[in-house]
Structures are given as C-alpha cells and as structure tokens.
Amino acid sequence: MLAVPDTPQAVGWYKRALGATELWNFGSVAGLEIAGAVFFLGEPANNGWESPLKLGMTSARVEVFCDDPDAFIAQAVQAGANGSTDKIKNHETPWGTHRQGGFIDPFGHIWLVGDRSPLRHFTS
C-alpha cells in the first residue's frame, strides 16, 4: 500500500496521470490498477506508517513494465511528476536491451518504468 496524505486527491492524480482504473474506494483507502497491476493507496492516520512527503524520504519504489515506457513517463511528468531524477534510457542487460526510466510522483513515491523485456525473458 502506498501511503498518501489525501487518498481522493491521489486517486485522481493516478487516474489522470497514469491511466489507473479505480477498483474500489473507501475514502481513506482505495484499490487501483495500472497496466494490469493492482495496488492500494491509503492515508496513514497515525497507525505506525507514514507518507514519504511527511518522512522526507521513501523506503520503497514501484516498478512497472509496459509497452511504451517513454509515453508512460511523459504522461506522468506532464501531470506534475518529477522526471528529472532518472531519465529514460536503454540499459544493456544479460537478456538484451532494456529501456527504463523513472519519476517521483507528487506524493513522494519513486516509480521505475521499463519495457517488457525482462518479463519476456524470464517468463518464456
């Protein structure tokens, strides 16, 4: 679950910026889906965890594999994500070239977005 300070605001951003589908929403907790991956958002509410914005750092990163990482990242940056930290580029790997880059969303979460080459290599 990604900690966010305002779940409705975060749901709106993820839908607009990343094309997320809202699966369910209880106000302070919601389930979303992006590119076939389900994830949850929630407001910490002083129950032992906190959002990266309040902590001043993040302890996790979200990784997404998709057909067009350039477009995915560009859409997020256009909607307000910080795309300056991990510019998209080709990486040489044991299975060939893997295109990947990243951004930090407005809620402080690090996202790495790459093409599907690792999935094709490890699941075929």
Feature names for model-found ranges:
Residues 1, 11-104, 113-124:
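Vicinal oxygen chelate
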Residues 2-6:
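Short, surface-exposed ligand-recognition loops at beta-strand->loop->(often short) alpha-helix junctions
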Residues 107:
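Adenine-nucleotide cofactor-binding loop residues
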